Amino acid sequence: MKPSDTRHIPVLGPEAVGLLAPRAGGIYVDGTFGAGGYTRLILETAGSRVIAIDRDPTAIAGGADLVADAGHRLTLVQDRFSNLADVCAAQGAATVDGVVMDIGVSSMQLDQAERGFSFRFDGPLDMRMGRDGPSAADVVARASETDLANIIYIFGEERYSRHVARAIVAARSDAPITTTKALADIVAKVVRAKPGEIHPATRTFQGLRIFVNEELDELHQALDAAERVLKPGGRLAVVSFHSLEDRIVKTFLTERSKTGGGSRHLPEVAQAAPSFTLLSKRPIVAGDAEVAANPRARSAKLRGAERTEAPAHAAGDLPGWPTLASVMRAGR
């Protein structure tokens, strides 16, 4: 079935689109089109227009029917959402009324064995959301033991990362690791899960997937881009699924919504005027009914903010974690 043929309701979809408050004549960016859930909900507002972005060619192909149905109201672009400012400019939209993002891998991608995202199915060890750049198999084959340990620890939050990296290096000296099952079996030998705990390979797969797709760097850059394209009163809604993503979103919005500074002990420090106003102090989470229907919703957090009239802040430096280019360049 094509993604566009489903009536998929994304996690916290009504809540996220509710924060956007779409209106007739408004232009909205769906930075992570996927199966088109957010886009469909936005298009329910008559007269609204959506610029939808996805780096996955499968999602783009699957959205063809929705594009045909929506006509001029929907433009679907294959690109990274970090490039959303350039995408909007190319579509004649210097500013937009709202941006929504759903961070991380989609259920559609996880369920396709040939994409290599999940240890639940045996398939090629790929994990790329697009079809360009090194695959997870390339990283596993070429990264040094130290780099592998850092990738799995930083992006997968796996406390046994050094044990996993050592096991991978030992195994690849005997035979290439090219399938999801092969990698999951290697990890399961050194990470012992207790009954009721997540699969022992969960964090290793997460770390490699985030690294291969440069997901956290992409998120940093996409947030900066959204800040630049949102018009005053425009709204940003971001759904994240684990602590690494949520921490980035929370920090970004907190820093850009700060007012004042200083105290009776320290002088006030000049700082840029707030570029966002938070729509809620705490993240919005899924209710019991949604979690029962979709267990993936359990970890979801939605944060939203409204753009002020202040200029966009200067883009921050990316954290100094391992990069795909540097690891592959240094690889054996």
UniProtKB/Swiss-Prot annotation:
SUPFAM superfamilies: Putative methyltransferase TM0872, insert domain, S-adenosyl-L-methionine-dependent methyltransferases. S-adenosyl-L-methionine binds at residues 36-38, 54, 81, 102, 109. It catalyses: cytidine(1402) in 16S rRNA + S-adenosyl-L-methionine = N(4)-methylcytidine(1402) in 16S rRNA + S-adenosyl-L-homocysteine + H(+). NCBIfam families: 16S rRNA (cytosine(1402)-N(4))-methyltransferase RsmH (TIGR00006). Residues 297-318 are annotated as: Disordered. Belongs to the methyltransferase superfamily. RsmH family. GO terms for cellular component: cytoplasm. One of its GO terms (biological process) is rRNA base methylation. This is Ribosomal RNA small subunit methyltransferase H. It comes from the Bacteria.
